[in-house]
C-alpha cells in the first residue's frame, strides 16, 4: 500500500483565508479518519508534509493558503484512504486574481506536490511539529468578485447606506469552448466581514438606475453610429434593437441590448438580481456597473463585451 497519497480537487474561487481579504488559492487538509477527528501516526504524517508544503508555497502566494474543514465524512474518498492507512493530503484549488483559467494555480499545485515529494524522500517531514499545521488559517467563504462599500440607496422615500456584493458568474456557450457572464447580486447590507477581489470605496456615491435609450435601433450596424460611452455618461444603460443577431450571447458594447418585445422591469436592488446601475456623486454620474463589472466613466472603455442581451 502507498504510504502517502494526494487527493486533488477544484474549489470555488470565493473562499478566502479566514479573516483576510486574500483568496484561499490553495487549501490543504489532512482528512479526519473518524468522527472524533483523532490524530494517529498516519494522519500526523500528512499534517507534517502539509506544513512543509505551506512553508514553500508562502514564497509564491503569501497569505493565500487555507486549511479546509476537517469534519469527518464517511463517504468521502480522502477520509477513507486516510482510514485505510495512507497518509492522505487533500489539495483544493481555489481562486487567484486575474486567473480565470487557473493557470497560475496549476503552477502552485506543481510546487506543492514537488515540495511534498522532496520532504518525503529526504525524511525531513518527520522532524516537523504538527502544532504548525493548526496555525494555517481556515478557509472561509467570504470573498466576492466585486464589493461596493458604503453606497447610498434610495428606497421608498428613505436613504440607506449599504454595501453591495457581486459575483460574476460564468455561463458556458454551446459546445463549451467559451463562456460569457451573467452576474448576480450576492449580498446586501453591512458586509464588513466580507471581501472583494475588486473593492470600490463608495462613501458619498449614490446608486442611480439606468435609462432606456429612446430611439430603437434597426440592427447591429446602427451601433457604429453611437457614442456608447457618452450614452453611459448621460445615464443610458439599455438599447432597444429590432433585429438582434441570433449568434450573439452577450452585447458587443457596454450597454444591454433589449428586444422590442421585452419589458424592462422597474429598478430594484435585490439579492439574485443582475447588478446594472450607475454610481453618482455631487449630481454627476461617475461610474457604471454593467452586468456586475465596474467601469470608470472618466477613463477610456474598450473591448467590453460583458453586457447582457434581453430577447
Task: Give residue ranges: language-model regions.
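C-terminal accessory segments enriched in acidic
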Residues: 29-37, 46-311
Amino acid at each position: 500500500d502507498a504510504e502517502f497519497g494526494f487527493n486533488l480537487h477544484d474549489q470555488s474561487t470565493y473562499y478566502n483565508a479566514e479573516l483576510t481579504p486574500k483568496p484561499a488559492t490553495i487549501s490543504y487538509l489532512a482528512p479526519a479518519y473518524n468522527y472524533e477527528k483523532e490524530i494517529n501516526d498516519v494522519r500526523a504524517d500528512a499534517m507534517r508534509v502539509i506544513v512543509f508544503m505551506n512553508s514553500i508555497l508562502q514564497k509564491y502566494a503569501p497569505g493565500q493558503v487555507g486549511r479546509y474543514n476537517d469534519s469527518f465524512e464517511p463517504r468521502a474518498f480522502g477520509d477513507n484512504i486516510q482510514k485505510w492507512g495512507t497518509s492522505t493530503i487533500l489539495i483544493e484549488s481555489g481562486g487567484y486574481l486575474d486567473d480565470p483559467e487557473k493557470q497560475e494555480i496549476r503552477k502552485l499545485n506543481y510546487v506543492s506536490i514537488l515540495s511534498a515529494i522532496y520532504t518525503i524522500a529526504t525524511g525531513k517531514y518527520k522532524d516537523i511539529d504538527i502544532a504548525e499545521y493548526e496555525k494555517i488559517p481556515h478557509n472561509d467563504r467570504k470573498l466576492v468578485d466585486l464589493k461596493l462599500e458604503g453606497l447610498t440607496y434610495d428606497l421608498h422615500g428613505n436613504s440607506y447606506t449599504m454595501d453591495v456584493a457581486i459575483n460574476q458568474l460564468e455561463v458556458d456557450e454551446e459546445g463549451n469552448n467559451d463562456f460569457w457572464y451573467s452576474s448576480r447580486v450576492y449580498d446586501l447590507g453591512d458586509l464588513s466581514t466580507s471581501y472583494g477581489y475588486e473593492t470600490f470605496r463608495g462613501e458619498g456615491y449614490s446608486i442611480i438606475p439606468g435609462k432606456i435609450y429612446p430611439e430603437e435601433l434597426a440592427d447591429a450596424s446602427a451601433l457604429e453610429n453611437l457614442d456608447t460611452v457618452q450614452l453611459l455618461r448621460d445615464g443610458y444603460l439599455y438599447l432597444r434593437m429590432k433585429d438582434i443577431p441570433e449568434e450573439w450571447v452577450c452585447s458587443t458594447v457596454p450597454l444591454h441590448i433589449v428586444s422590442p418585445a421585452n419589458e424592462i422591469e422597474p429598478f430594484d436592488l435585490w439579492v439574485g438580481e443582475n447588478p446594472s446601475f450607475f454610481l453618482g456623486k455631487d449630481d454627476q454620474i461617475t461610474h457604471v456597473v454593467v452586468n456586475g463589472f465596474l467601469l470608470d466613466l472618466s477613463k477610456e472603455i474598450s473591448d467590453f463585451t460583458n453586457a447582457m442581451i434581453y430577447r
